């Protein structure tokens, strides 16, 4: 049976919720997922079978389904969050090393961080703001692009990893 499998075979059908009209089914073929595996194999080079991922979205959501397939492809342990309303507690229980979610979730995390920063002053506030800037450059401008960050950025990132980032990760539960 495996010998007859094709990239063009149907992998699954995902349906829209119908909130803006009639629900629609989208036929997704294995080639869609395999192409994503190839791209992520090149870009997410640190993802290994030692990682733990936590599903936050329903598996009917294409983003979560594709992420779950990628985790299976990489041998990552997948934990399913059964209590969406208790996401912060669940994250602290699971302590995922990887997680994908829609931007709104991370916007809420970011807003919480910004609120904490606004309550601080002086050197502590300056260090927190610089840590965000360094992290953004390190991860978005370099690692996400498959590039090596400059040495100075790497040094600053390591410093913040041992101070601010580790504290933040521990607070969120993603250490």
Where are these regions (language model features)?
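Conserved pre-ATP/AMP-binding loop-to-beta segment of ANL
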Residues: 1-15, 22, 46-52
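Conserved AMP-binding/adenylation subdomain of ANL enzymes
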Residues: 34-52, 59-166, 171
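Short, intrinsically disordered, charge-balanced linker/junction segments flanking boundaries
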Residues: 173-175
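Short aromatic/basic micro-patch
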Residues: 4, 27, 100
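Conserved AMP-binding A3 loop
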Residues: 11-37
